[in-house]
Design a protein with these regions (language model features):
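Glycine- and acidic-residue-biased ligand/ion/polar-headgroup-sensing regions
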Residues: 1-18, 108, 120-166, 172, ...
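A short glycine-rich, His/Asp/Glu-containing loop-to-beta-strand
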Residues: 82-133
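A cross-kingdom feature marking solvent-exposed beta-strand/loop segments within repeated
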Residues: 15-29
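Short, structured patches in soluble enzyme cores that scaffold and shape functional sites
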Residues: 36, 44-46, 53-57, 90, ...
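Conserved metal-binding segment of the jelly-roll/cupin
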Residues: 25-45, 56, 161-182
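Short, well-ordered, mixed-charge alpha-helical segments that flank or form enzyme active sites
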Residues: 41-42, 59-63, 110-113
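Double-stranded beta-helix
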Residues: 48-94, 150, 188-211
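Generic beta-strand structural signal
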Residues: 30-32, 38-40, 47-51, 99-102, ...
Length: 211
């Protein structure tokens, strides 16, 4: 649940008034996991109701489950002007077949997904292949951020200005984000791949930043 509340049914399970925050910038999210092959119903139960449907191909999945906001423990990643807050929603510690979901809050003027990393090669335990999307929201509607998407050989080399509600697909390569000064940034990451592990490779040019 991005914001507001909804009644949700997945298979034979149902939950009322799922959702506990007025916006993505206030608090942690409630979420519901629904496996493949079972019906999913969502009905708004508040005037404001914003829902993100995050899905990936799967054959079996796991049992339907409510993942309450109280179970999402915020933590910091980075420091100084790379500090951001992470809300892990459906990562490796929760059952699913291929889906990984997390959200990140980046203060105005800070960099995120930084130092730049990638996960486009199946080379476990160094790196896993994961497709990914970024769903961006800005704390003010006129706000913006900049997302880079590039590869080592620069066969892909894009700088994208993103606004409130924009989605960026990461087909491959490194993908750092910068929040414009004055505009706090939220993004929802949805990832999936043949191996459900988040293992990344940092851009060698910037690996020294981790020392």
């Amino acid at each position: 649940m991005l914001a507001g509340q909804a009644d949700i049914a997945a298979g034979s399970h149902s939950w009322g008034n799922v959702g506990s925050r007025p916006s993505v910038f206030e608090g942690t999210p409630d979420a519901v996991y629904a496996p493949p092959g079972q019906p999913l119903e969502i009905a708004a139960s508040s005037e404001l109701c914003e829902v993100a449907l995050c899905w990936a191909p799967a054959d079996r999945g796991a049992e339907p489950a409510l993942m309450p906001a109280s179970g999402v423990k915020p933590f910091k990643r980075g420091s100084g002007n790379t500090e951001r807050t992470i809300h892990n929603i459906l990562m490796e510690d929760r059952p699913a077949e291929s889906l990984l979901v997390t959200e990140v809050l980046t203060p105005a003027g800070n960099w995120s997904s930084y130092p730049p990393h990638k996960h486009d090669t199946d080379d476990e335990p160094r790196e896993t292949y994961l497709e990914e999307t970024y769903y961006h929201r800005t704390a003010r509607p006129e706000g913006f951020a900049v997302q880079l998407v590039y590869t080592d050989d620069r066969s892909l080399d894009e700088a994208i200005q993103v606004g409130d509600g924009d989605v960026v697909l990461i087909p491959r390569g490194y993908h750092p984000v910068a929040a414009a000064p004055g505009y706090d940034l939220y993004y929802l990451n949805v990832m999936a791949g043949p191996r459900r592990r988040w293992l990344v490779t940092t851009d060698p040019d910037h690996r020294w930043l981790l020392d």
